[in-house]
Structures are given as structure tokens and as C-alpha cells.
Design a protein with these regions (language model features):
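Membrane-interfacial helical/loop segments at transmembrane boundaries in membrane proteins
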Residues: 1-2, 62-76, 132-154, 265-292
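An N-terminal, globular interaction/scaffold subdomain
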Residues: 1-102
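Membrane-helix interface "capping/anchor" motifs
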Residues: 29-41, 100-110, 233-246
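Hydrophobic alpha-helical transmembrane segments and adjacent interfacial helices
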Residues: 44-65, 93-101, 116-133, 195-211, ...
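Hydrophobic cores of alpha-helical transmembrane segments in multi-pass inner/ER membrane proteins
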Residues: 15-25, 82-100, 161-176, 223-229, ...
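Generic multipass alpha-helical transmembrane bundles of integral membrane proteins
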Residues: 106-239
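Membrane-interface module
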Residues: 100-116, 151-161, 167-184, 260-308
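C-terminal transmembrane-bundle signature of multipass membrane proteins
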Residues: 14-26, 220-308
């Protein structure tokens, strides 16, 4: 099994997944259906959170206990989380500019390249993180290393292979000059984002989370990837990349403020790499003594293969 879902917490883990999936689908609809929803989600909310994050780090620099013990500061302090949050939010804002034809940018044919650029940047952020894990592991054969957030990661050749798959995925994007707004202005449509590309992207990105966010992947890997795909398949065909950006940005905001939902609650779910050690091994004070990377290797091979 890819995830450790069993015992007394299994019901809560499944419930948590359903809540995250449904919540992301609903929030995406709020953000995409009106200007007010989009502005609230991707301009007002990120601005307020930025003030909150700055206050935390200023407080921590001054030695304030409330800041040093803040969940965001303790559990979500890596460069990756902030880079992903703001890159995804930038994508959402850019997509709204195109969708609503705001200003000269929104009416410019040249700005249609923006979605390709911002998606490529988001992919490269993850690729850099994958390569970092391979280096920090100390051996391509596999090795444990402790992240800045206190989670043990098992890096190795699977990170390198998945990183290469991410680079290939960038070159799989085509047709951005054909991007246009739907007649009702609810969606920015990228017709060339067909199911073949979505499948390749989803497998690659799921593997990224599986390798590098093993305490979050059940939610940010599985639920977060299926929510935009579900919506695009059923009611806003061609709008997958917009759905993906919206749900990613919203999830990053939630996870940054409420990290214990994934890290230390009855909903916490970890991958199979920790073996019998489970959650205790993932966030323990000492290096895990068991590693089961079989699933990591298999998914990386699949990720590379589908992107080739």
C-alpha cells in the first residue's frame, strides 16, 4: 500500500481526504465563477496572510515566544512552501488578467505566454526540491535526511529520475498562443492541455509530493491533484490549468496557516517509506532505522516513462 491507512485512525484519514477534496472543489468554484471571488481568494487573502507571515518572522527574529512557537514558523519554514504559495498565487492573478482582459496585459497577445512561463516556474521549483533531496541524502542508493521542518525524508535516485520527469513535462506543454476566455468569463481555457498531458503532470507531481512531502502527500498529492482534474472532466473542459492553480494556491494558504491538520492530528497520514515506524518514525527525534522505498522507485519510473 502506498499510504499507511489502517487501524483506529483509518476512518478519520479517509474522512479528512474527502473533506479536503470537496473543500477544494467548492473553493475553486467560488474563485472561478466571479471577479469578487477571485479577488478575495487571490488578492485580498494572500495580502492579509503576507502581513501575518512577516509579523511571525519579525517576532521570531526578536525572540518572541509566540512567534518562535507558532505552528507556521515551526512546521512550514522551508523555502519550498513559500515559493510554491506565491508562485501559484501569481499564476492565479495572471490567469484572471487573461480571463477578464484586465488592462493592456489582459488584451495583449504576448501575455498568453504567461501561463506557460508560470507553470514552468512552478515545475522547476519542485524539480529543484527533488534534486536537493537527492543531494542531501548523501547517496543515490538512498539515505535519510532531516528537513528544516523536522520530517525525515528518504532521498535517492528516485528523486533524480522524478526531477528529470518534471523537466520533460515542461517541454510537453504546447499551444499557449491558443489560450482564450470562455464566453461567460468564468474560465481561462487552454485547449492543448488535453488528458494525456494532465495524466503525465499528475503522476509526476504526485510523485514529487510522495518523495518530498511524505506527511502531506495523502492530501497535497492525491486530493489536491484530483480536485482540479475532476472539475475539468465534468463541467469546465479546457480549464484544468486554471483549476490547478486555484486549488494549489488555496491549499498552500490553508496548509501554511494550519499545518497540524497534516502533521499532528487524527487526520495525519504518511507514506509507506517509514515501514512499521509510521508517523513516529517520520517525525521522530532520531533517524528511522527502517526504510521501504520500493513504492518510491516504482512511481518514479512510471513518472519518467509517461513524460517520455
Amino acid at each position: 500500500m502506498f499510504f499507511q491507512i489502517y487501524g483506529e485512525t483509518a476512518g478519520w484519514q479517509l474522512l479528512g481526504w474527502l473533506l479536503v477534496f470537496a473543500g477544494l472543489v467548492v473553493m475553486n468554484e467560488i474563485a472561478r465563477r466571479s471577479k469578487a471571488g477571485g479577488i478575495a481568494c487571490f488578492l485580498i487573502l494572500p495580502a492579509a496572510l503576507s502581513v501575518y507571515f512577516i509579523a511571525i518572522y519579525v517576532g521570531a527574529a526578536m525572540g518572541a515566544d509566540w512567534a518562535l512557537n507558532n505552528d507556521t514558523y515551526v512546521h512550514m519554514n522551508s523555502w519550498f512552501h513559500y515559493a510554491k504559495l506565491y508562485a501559484a498565487t501569481a499564476g492565479c492573478i495572471g490567469f484572471m488578467i487573461l480571463k477578464y482582459h484586465w488592462g493592456k496585459l489582459g488584451k495583449s497577445h504576448g501575455f498568453k505566454a504567461f501561463p506557460f512561463i508560470i507553470v514552468a516556474i512552478n515545475i522547476l521549483i519542485a524539480v529543484a526540491s527533488d534534486f536537493e533531496s537527492a543531494v542531501r541524502a548523501g547517496s543515490l542508493a538512498g539515505g535519510w535526511w532531516l528537513s528544516s521542518e523536522g520530517v525525515w525524508l528518504y532521498g535517492g535516485w528516485w528523486n533524480v529520475l522524478n526531477g528529470l520527469a518534471g523537466i520533460l513535462n515542461i517541454f510537453c506543454m504546447t499551444g499557449w498562443w491558443g489560450i482564450y476566455s470562455s464566453k461567460d468569463k468564468k474560465d481561462m481555457l487552454w485547449p492543448d492541455m488535453i488528458w494525456v498531458y494532465v495524466l503525465a503532470y499528475d503522476i509526476w507531481n504526485f510523485q514529487y509530493t510522495y518523495l518530498n512531502l511524505p506527511t502531506h502527500s495523502w492530501y497535497c498529492g492525491l486530493a489536491l491533484l484530483l480536485a482540479p482534474t475532476f472539475a475539468a472532466a465534468l463541467w469546465n473542459k479546457g480549464g484544468w490549468i486554471q483549476n490547478r492553480a486555484n486549488t494549489l494556491a488555496l491549499w498552500c494558504m490553508f496548509a501554511q496557516v494550519f499545518p497540524l491538520f497534516q502533521d499532528a492530528s487524527r487526520f495525519t497520514t504518511v507514506t509507506s517509506v517509514y515501514g512499521q515506524g509510521g508517523i513516529a518514525a517520520a517525525m521522530g527525534s532520531s533517524m528511522p532505522t527502517i526504510a521501504e522505498p520500493t513504492a518510491q522507485g516504482i512511481i518514479s519510473v512510471l513518472s519518467f516513462a509517461v513524460n517520455v
